[in-house]
Regions:
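Conserved N-terminal segment of class I S-adenosyl-L-methionine
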Residues: 1-92, 202-247
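A conserved beta-strand element that flanks and buttresses the S-adenosyl-L-methionine
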Residues: 101
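Short catalytic micro-motifs in class I SAM-dependent methyltransferases
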Residues: 104-107
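A short glycine-rich, Lys/Arg-flanked "PGG" loop and its adjoining helix->strand segment in the class I
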Residues: 113-128
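Short, glycine-/aromatic-enriched active-site segment of Class I SAM-dependent methyltransferases
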Residues: 131-153
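Short alpha-helix
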Residues: 153-168
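Conserved S-adenosyl-L-methionine
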Residues: 170-181
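Short hydrophobic/aromatic beta-strand or adjacent loop that forms the aromatic wall/cage
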Residues: 183-189
Length: 247
């Protein structure tokens, strides 16, 4: 875990979860959620399980069916809407969900491409994957700072994750992305497309352009240089702010 406590981790999650809550139509469309790497305290999972909707001043529970998976033998949350499965979060779980919530856990995947392919198959058609991943290369006090935490074997970047997600069949053209300057957290919200995961050994940038899965600014960069440059990216976040990553 990248935080000093589970509560601190949950507070960080709420920055994104509360943006979801500000879109009631989206929340009401969600029937099932899987929290990948939910942790023993499972605060994020409990958040999903206890959400309510205000319909003409009548408060009603959404009753989202929630599944948590992690390597622990138990979690500390007990709720009728929550099911827990002891399971590693790289291999395929034989169940489909509307939302996969993956906060501060994907960085531990030993085979990230395989994990993303499995996540694709764990989603319902058009389902949403939310990845929130720490970067190990960051700007601190106008200098590059490098870190290598325990069990982090990949240096994930925003553009690298978009590359992997699109190869894995996720729609990044319609996705939402954020990595603020001086913020080590990369946030990606993408959707399962009707394009099956492709072979990462043979799929080129131009192949990805043909699928329509890449952000428009990424396609423009590829058409200009033959590959995607981070400084060309202009991406939208959940609050509909546009961020240029060339600054």
């Amino acid at each position: 875990m990248s935080f000093s406590s589970a509560q601190e981790s949950h507070q960080h999650s709420l920055e994104t979860l509360e943006l979801f809550y500000s879109h009631p139509d989206f929340m009401e469309s969600v029937d099932s959620v899987c929290d990948i790497g939910c942790g023993k305290e499972a605060f994020d999972l409990e958040w999903w399980a206890t959400q309510e909707v205000d319909d003409d001043d009548v408060i009603s529970p959404l009753n989202i069916k929630c599944t948590g998976i992690d390597i622990h033998n138990m979690i500390l949350v007990n709720h009728d809407n929550i099911t827990y499965k002891q399971h590693d979060f790289e291999t395929l779980l034989d169940q489909e969900f509307d939302v996969l919530w993956c906060h501060d856990s994907f960085q531990y995947a030993l085979s990230p491409m395989l994990a993303l392919s499995n996540y694709y198959h764990m989603l319902t058609d058009g389902g949403m994957l939310a990845l929130i991943v720490p970067s190990t290369t960051n700007l601190e006090y106008n200098k590059l700072a490098f870190s290598q935490p325990n069990f982090h074997y990949y240096n994930h970047t925003l553009d690298g994750l978009i590359h992997m997600l699109s190869i894995s069949g996720f729609d990044c053209e319609s996705g939402f992305f954020q990595q603020q300057l001086n913020d080590r957290w990369i946030k990606l919200i993408v959707y399962k497309s009707d394009v099956e995961p492709m072979d990462p050994k043979t799929t080129t940038w131009y192949d990805l352009v043909e699928t329509g899965l890449l952000p428009v600014s990424g396609v423009e960069s590829i058409n200009k240089y033959g590959y995607m440059k981070r400084e060309d990216l202009v991406l939208t976040w959940l609050d509909y702010s546009n961020i240029w990553y060339g600054q």
